[in-house]
Amino acid sequence: MSNKSDRDIEKAYSTAEFVSKLRRLADALESGDKFEIQIAGERIYVPVRAIYNIEHEREGNEEEIEFQIKWQND
C-alpha cells in the first residue's frame, strides 16, 4: 500500500455539482456500496464502514454546516 501525504483541501462547487455529488453519496449509502469521489485531481474511495456526521459552527455573524465522512485506512 502506498504511503499518502497529509492533505487538507476545500473545494467549491456549483449548486448543480454539489447536488449531483450528494445524490451519488445517498445512492451509495442506500445500496450499501462504497462511494468514490474525485477532489482536486485525487480519486478518493470511501469505504462502507465510514462514519457520517454533520457539524455546525457559528462565529460572529458567520455560520457553517459541514457534512463529514470519516474513516481510517488499514
At which residue positions do the language-model features occur?
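N-terminal acidic leader/helix
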Residues: S2-E30
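N-terminal intrinsically disordered, cationic/polar leader segments
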Residues: S2-D8, K34-Q38, E42-D74
